[in-house]
Regions:
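Charged/polar, solvent-exposed surface patches and flexible loops
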Residues: 52, 65, 90, 205, ...
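C-terminal effector/catalytic modules and regulatory tails appended to multi-domain proteins
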Residues: 1-65, 284-287, 293-365
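Generic detection of long, well-ordered alpha-helical segments
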Residues: 82-85, 197, 242, 277, ...
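Divalent metal-dependent catalytic cores for phosphoryl transfer on phosphate-bearing substrates
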Residues: 119-304
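Detector for Asparagine
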Residues: 11, 35, 41, 55, ...
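Acidic/His-rich, divalent-metal-binding segments that scaffold phosphate/diphosphate chemistry
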Residues: 2-178
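A general structural signal for alpha-helical elements within enzymatic catalytic domains
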Residues: 97-100, 208, 212-215, 344
């Protein structure tokens, strides 16, 4: 088998990183594999890892606005979803060379360079996307216990003044989302009728509202502010970053919308060239294995065992090879088949080619 995810997660480096002897995330946050995936409290360690990124960037309000109570935080920090989000982030980080240049070119069409001429860093976009996309999964099911809160979160979306659908980019161009506003709100209401809060839509709306509010309060009338933090690190607040946030919010909002229950048809095939960040999130969210193999207490495999027995590597330009060994198949046959089938069916709703071998899948787009 090619390099296992466990080995990749332990040895992640980035070409823009000054220190390459440590596995570092954005803000030079250390990626401590054993803590995240082998400790007794993996879920809490992963939640701390998520918090650390938003705290370091002084964006923690985005999480506290949506996880309004200690009970919410407790639920998420004890949930597999926190581990899934971290694994998804590290999976994307390990494959950044597949996407970074394409995303940079795409964003340059709409956002351009900041006044300081800083180069684009995939890790910034990706940590905000991956570590937030399932943040409201702890509130997804509407019950008698949380009915008022669940319906209020939906109402907040509907009444939100700051939203991606009314947003104009700094260039003056109007932002064009993956799905129109009416369709998204209809989809949200249809989910509510089934006692579900679509966690992607609610998270994406809240992300955009919170991030824009944070930056507006910090910047005031200024275009750019460079702030020195407690750890002698420089933190930049740039108005053009709000353009960045609208693309991230759109990816989060749309990442669960692939089937229209009203028409009982797929919503159309997603194209990499048209919405690359949305495409990447849905692609890797489907591939990320922890969510599938460890989703219930009956799972026989631990988090690290899943990552040690699955490989996901860049095989060529716009080509990923996913392979596994017999441990995965023999221990969790039913979950392995479901995970593999979900990946194989990506070509039903994404413009992607899937090739199957005896112990691997190859994806081309």
């Amino acid at each position: 088998m090619d390099c296992a995810l466990a080995e990749k997660y332990k040895n992640l480096t980035h070409e823009k990183e000054i220190c390459k002897k440590l596995s570092l995330s954005y803000y030079s946050i250390q990626i401590k594999y054993k803590n995240l995936f082998e400790s007794e409290n993996c879920e809490k360690e992963c939640y701390r890892f998520i918090e650390q990124h938003f705290n370091c960037g002084k964006k923690m309000t985005a999480i506290s606005d949506i996880l309004g109570t200690n009970e919410d935080i407790k639920t998420l920090s004890e949930s597999i979803r926190s581990v899934h989000m971290v694994s998804l982030y590290l999976l994307g980080y390990s494959l950044y060379q597949c996407f970074e240049d394409d995303l940079n070119k795409y964003f340059m069409q709409y956002i351009g360079k900041s006044d300081r001429g800083e180069e684009y860093d995939f890790r910034y976009t990706w940590f905000l996307t991956a570590l937030f996309h399932d943040i409201t999964s702890c509130k997804e099911v509407i019950t008698k216990h949380n009915e008022i809160e669940g319906k209020q979160s939906i109402e907040n979306v509907i009444k939100s003044e700051k939203n991606i659908y009314d947003y104009k980019l700094q260039s003056g161009k109007k932002f064009i989302p993956k799905f129109p506003k009416d369709f998204v709100l209809r989809y949200l209401k249809e989910r509510e009728e089934k006692d579900r809060v679509d966690h992607g839509i609610v998270a994406g709306y809240n992300f955009f509202n919170s991030m824009c509010t944070i930056f507006e309060q910090k910047l005031g009338e200024e275009e750019i502010i460079v702030e020195k933090t407690d750890k002698e690190r420089m933190l930049m607040w740039d108005k053009t970053y709000m353009d960045h946030f609208v693309f991230i919010a759109d990816a989060i909002i749309s990442h669960n919308i692939w089937f229209d229950e009203k028409t009982e048809k797929m919503v159309g095939k997603w194209a990499y060239e048209e919405n690359p960040l949305n495409f990447i999130l849905c692609l890797l969210d489907t591939i990320e294995p922890i969510k599938r193999f460890c989703e219930d207490k009956r799972s026989t495999l631990k988090y690290n065992e899943v990552l040690e027995n699955i490989s996901v590597i860049k095989d060529d330009e716009r080509k990923i090879k996913i392979s596994w060994n017999d441990v995965i198949r023999n221990c969790e046959l039913e979950k392995w088949e479901r995970w593999k089938d979900n990946i194989k069916k990506l070509d039903e709703w994404m413009k992607i080619d899937v090739e199957e071998g005896s112990d691997f899948l190859i994806l081309r787009w």
